[in-house]
Regions:
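Gly-rich Lys/Arg/Thr-decorated short loops/hinges at beta-loop-alpha junctions or inter-strand turns
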Residues: 3-12, 150-157, 201
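Glycine-/charge-enriched secondary-structure boundary and capping motifs
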Residues: 55-73, 86-91, 145, 152-163, ...
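Glycine-rich phosphate/pyrophosphate-binding loop regions near the starts of catalytic domains
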Residues: 1-124
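Short, acidic (Asp/Glu-rich) active-site segment that either coordinates a divalent metal cofactor
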Residues: 92, 105-158
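A generic structural signal for residues located within well-ordered alpha-helices
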Residues: 20, 129, 165-168
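Short loop/turn motifs at secondary-structure junctions
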Residues: 36-38, 133, 181, 266
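Short helix/loop capping segments that flank catalytic or ligand/cofactor-binding pockets
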Residues: 8, 128-130, 196-197
């Protein structure tokens, strides 16, 4: 079960509701694959201040598109009007996904071992996390508007970058799980890499991540520069260009990367697990505009 957080406010303010449903599906099904489960079906809950049939249609169409890409069935949902509690154009969207995994294939955080390498899968945008900070930086600190260019000379606006749809990783990760030995899968959501990698390893391991192994998308760098935010805070709020991380035996890393690439999900080795105490260490110098 998950939602899309305050990204929905950007969608409401712009009236661009067509992709927010896809974001919802991504947040739910990509959590499922962290347990090794393949998504089976999906339900949604939509609360509105006042029902707008066109808006509801756009939201549900986005959910249906996301489910089709994720390979799960949209089997139902619930819609509720909350007049007097929510503003007429406000909405809240929640999703619920169910998947299946054989008991002996369940990923529970105990399989990862020292020497495993970390394979990061690229995320070109914010996905659905960090929007409270992103909104504060762009609107309150920098005084920008949604129609402004995302950066000087950009062909996209702030709204375009903030509403860019989340990548759905589930089909590619399910394929990799079926073909290779994978010890852990982490969904990089709120908390970033430092907050999510500890969920998939025990406290006898450390995750050592090399920042120089991938390029941070420019919009993250633009947000950071708007408010002079520290690297540590950026990495604890945003995905910084990596939406999922897999822990795999070193001998299988290249094959896993190739399988993910064959499903149009570019990935690369970004670090390793070492003997430790449950910490995440961010080493190296970041690629991307600082």
């Amino acid at each position: 079960t998950d939602g899309v957080g305050t990204k929905s406010e950007i969608a409401r303010e712009t009236g661009r509701l067509d992709s927010i449903g896809r974001d919802l599906v991504a947040m739910c099904v990509d959590d499922l694959v962290c347990a090794g489960a393949a998504p089976l079906f999906f339900l949604d809950y939509l609360a509105v201040g006042r029902l707008d049939p066109d808006a509801a249609e756009s939201l549900v169409a986005g959910i249906a598109d996301g489910c089709a890409e994720a390979g799960c069935a949209l089997i139902g949902g619930e819609m509720a009007e909350h007049p007097g509690v929510m503003a007429a154009d406000q909405f809240d969207l929640v999703g619920f996904a169910v998947g299946a995994v054989e008991r002996d294939a369940l990923l529970d955080g105990t399989a990862a071992v020292a020497g495993d390498v970390l394979v990061g899968i690229e995320s070109p945008n914010l996905r659905s996390n960090g929007f409270s900070l992103a909104r504060r930086l762009a609107f309150d600190v920098a005084g920008r508007s949604l129609d402004d260019p995302a950066w000087e000379g950009a062909s996209t606006t702030l709204a375009d970058e903030m509403l860019a749809p989340s990548v759905i990783y589930a089909p590619a990760v399910v394929a990799a799980l079926a073909a290779h030995e994978i010890h852990a899968v982490a969904h990089v959501t709120g908390g970033g890499l430092p907050g999510n990698l500890p969920r998939v390893m025990d406290n006898t391991l450390d995750a050592v991540v090399d920042r120089s192994t991938w390029e941070v998308p420019r919009f993250f760098c633009e947000l950071q520069n708007m408010g002079d935010v520290s690297d540590d805070e950026m990495e604890r709020v945003f995905n910084m260009g990596l939406g999922m991380v897999l822990a795999v035996p070193v001998h299988d890393a290249d094959a896993v990367v190739a399988t993910l690439a064959s499903h149009d999900r570019p990935a690369r080795v970004i670090g390793e697990l070492t003997v430790g105490s449950g910490q995440v260490r961010m080493d190296g110098t970041r690629q991307g505009d600082a």
